[in-house]
UniProtKB/Swiss-Prot annotation:
Subunit structure as annotated in this protein's UniProt entry: F-type ATPases have 2 components, CF(1) - the catalytic core - and CF(0) - the membrane proton channel. CF(1) has five subunits: alpha(3), beta(3), gamma(1), delta(1), epsilon(1). CF(0) has three main subunits: a(1), b(2) and c(9-12). The alpha and beta chains form an alternating ring which encloses part of the gamma chain. CF(1) is attached to CF(0) by a central stalk formed by the gamma and epsilon chains, while a peripheral stalk is formed by the delta and b chains.
Keywords, alphabetical: ATP synthesis, Cell inner membrane, Cell membrane, CF(0), Hydrogen ion transport, Ion transport, Membrane, Transmembrane, Transmembrane helix, Transport
Classification of source organism: Bacteria, Pseudomonadati, Pseudomonadota, Gammaproteobacteria, Legionellales
InterPro entries per the UniProt record, alphabetical: ATP_syn_F0_a_bact/chloroplast, ATP_synth_F0_asu, ATP_synth_F0_asu_AS, F0_ATP_A_sf
Transmembrane spans: 17-37, 78-98, 107-127, 165-187, 198-218
Organism: Legionella pneumophila (strain Paris)
Protein name in the entry: ATP synthase subunit a
């Protein structure tokens, strides 16, 4: 587990552009996930699926069912984004367990980027489901005076999403480091178990909140449209 702070520690620079530990680890995770996805799809078989393939199918099926329960009419549209978000955040949270690796989600800039992506996806999926004119109209109905309150709500929940994940992962790693400094390496297994459980929980919460925000945006606008058409 690396050193934590509001921003990841500097690693090196390329042409004056600073490269941090979180950037390096993020690229490592993305490349690793791409290779894993490619190898799974390249070798997949309907007749004789491998254990590796069955594990991935089980994970993706569980995610698909979870999304379907929240947003059944748009699951095909939402699934790629939310599933990718879940997997990336889970791996990012867990990689801090490996000595020498830094959890990107312990860097506020990374969690802020994920929150901004979620913020943009809420509006992107809403516009795709309804059209940009009808979607934007709902922000000024029943009166344009509600627009500032809508904007404040969108910004505040995006900030909360970023800070929640960052704070939990950073505090988890700091707590683990403090315990290890005090007790030494006599109790590594409980610390690792705590880290793994918390990493899974935080990845699930972030992905579920993103899903709820997307579903809320789509369904709220659809309900308003249905009410106006009656």
């Amino acid at each position: 587990m690396g050193e934590e702070g509001f921003l990841a520690h500097f690693a090196f620079s390329i042409g004056g552009l600073p490269i941090t530990q979180s950037v390096l680890t993020t690229w490592f995770i993305m490349i690793s996930l791409f290779i894993m996805a490619w190898s799974t799809t390249y070798k997949c078989s309907l007749l004789q699926p491998s254990t590796y393939q069955l594990i991935w199918e089980g994970v993706l099926s569980t995610m698909y069912d979870a999304i379907k329960e929240v947003l059944p009419d748009h699951v095909e549209l939402i699934f790629p984004f939310v599933a990718t978000l879940w997997i990336f955040i889970l791996v990012s949270n867990l990689i801090g367990v490996i000595p020498g690796f830094y959890s990107p989600t312990a860097d506020l800039s990374v969690t802020a980027s994920l929150a901004i992506m979620t913020f943009l996806s809420v509006h992107w999926f809403g516009i795709r489901a309804e059209g940009w004119r009808e979607y934007l109209k709902h922000y000024i109905k029943p009166t344009p005076f509600l627009l500032p309150f809508h904007l404040i709500s969108e910004i505040s929940r995006t900030l909360a999403l970023a800070v929640r994940l960052f704070g939990n992962i950073m505090s988890l790693q700091l707590t683990a480091l403090i315990v290890l400094m005090i007790a030494g390496f006599l109790v590594p297994i409980p610390i690792l178990i705590l880290h793994i459980i918390e990493a899974i929980i935080q990845a699930y919460i972030f992905g579920m909140l993103a899903l709820i925000y997307i579903a809320g945006g789509i369904q709220a606008h659809e309900l308003k449209s249905q009410g106006e058409s009656l």
